[in-house]
Amino acid sequence: MIHRRELLKSAALLAAGRAFGAGADQLHFGCQTNAWPIAARDFATVLAVIRKIKDYGYDGFETGFANVEGQFEHAAEARRQIDGIGARFFGVHIFLLQYDAETHVAPAALYERVAAGGALLGAEHLILSGTPPADDAGRKRKAEALNRAGAYAGQAGLRLAYHNHGPEVEHNGTEIEFLLRETDPSKVWFLLDAGHAFHAGADVPAFVRRHHTRLAGMHLRDYKNGEQVPLGMGDFPLRAVADAIRQTGWHGWVLNEEERLTSKPGDSAVKPARDALFRAFGKGV
């Protein structure tokens, strides 16, 4: 078994030569793997989805930590296989059904292990989701926890990105604005789930204009009559968001996320979503 200190040291050494500014003067297009069924214990199924994402013309991918944590003990071979596909590993995402009761994000022991292991696999971001605290005291603890997680991720050679769901942007964005104020911009970035934000009533183009300097990436998803549909088939203001991105000169990652609560639509959702995304940004399909 690899000890955590050894894992972190190895990850930091491997990541030291990786520049986050590589290609920083252009947008990057990615896709979350969660649109497809994956057998987390069978890494071949993960690689097959990454290869499919690359074949669709995306620059890179994001995936849940459960899909890759089994590779941490023999990361060199897994990294070789990922690199062989030619897709960048935008980020490894920790989504849980239950979070730390005090911090409202993943426990430190988990995110430290995932940050170190993810870095060995070539991940560029550690992505954390969380639950909404009930008051400012809880939000303060959450912000402090994100700062600590961001510092640790930085030691491993990754950037930390906090991913929102709907509650963070409800009530005029009370929580997300608090986290933006109280987290250290040198340690904490945000992965704006623009679809969740839109569904919760946020003015997404305006948010992008205000906070683009804190954004590592955006998840784009669409809704029609309260149900998620492939991007471009609902009411999400895709063109307006693309215009806001152009106007700000932001150069991060825009990612299709076509997960569903009760199914894995795969190609039937990703292909039209990819086409809509690429058209909106003038990228050939």
Feature roles, as predicted:
Residues 2-30, 38-39, 43-54, 173-192, ...:
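Histidine-acidic metal/acid-base catalytic patches
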Residues 12, 16-17, 84-88, 97-190, ...:
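Active-site acidic/histidine proton-transfer and metal-coordination neighborhood
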Residues 29-33, 61-63, 89-94, 126-128, ...:
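Hydrophobic faces of well-ordered beta-strands that scaffold small-molecule active sites
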Residues 37-43, 64-75, 97-107, 132-140, ...:
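Acidic-and-aromatic substrate-binding clefts and catalytic sites of carbohydrate-active enzymes
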Residues 47-64, 121-122:
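Catalytic domains of carbohydrate-active enzymes, especially glycoside hydrolases
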Residues 52-55, 81, 117-120, 148, ...:
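Alpha-helical scaffold elements within enzyme catalytic domains, especially in hydrolases
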Residues 67-69, 80, 186-190:
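Histidine- and aromatic-rich ligand-binding microenvironments
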Residues 74-85:
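Aromatic-lined substrate-binding rim segments of carbohydrate-active enzymes
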